[in-house]
């Protein structure tokens, strides 16, 4: 029933200006319309989107807030590191990263925190035929100017 409609995610932030600087300058997001309370929307591929909104509860989740499906985790990690994004390292039962990247369960993944303490991830499917066919936009077109 609901699967036929687009889905949007929320990104809770304590400081909208600081968070916007991170998402727009380091991750290359292009802002959409502003929403009440100083929030902002961002549009992504395939009709997906997110809304950044101010709240004192930002960064309190210990789980990933969102993830992006990419076609090459190593390339994305390298590009984001070059822009100043720091990736998390994990060493626990069932999850061990090497140079910020974990491999297992048919995927590669890397996690980073935004300025508000939210955990975000990038994931590359190693088995999905859709992921293999996806064409990535030219890197320079994605970068914030």
Residue ranges and their predicted role:
Residues 8-10, 41, 51, 65-67, ...:
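Short aromatic/hydrophobic contact patches that present stacked aromatics
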Residues 5, 38, 46-48, 62-64, ...:
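Residues that flank catalytic or metal-binding motifs in active/ligand-binding sites
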Residues 54-59, 126-128:
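A short, sequence-level motif marking secondary-structure junctions
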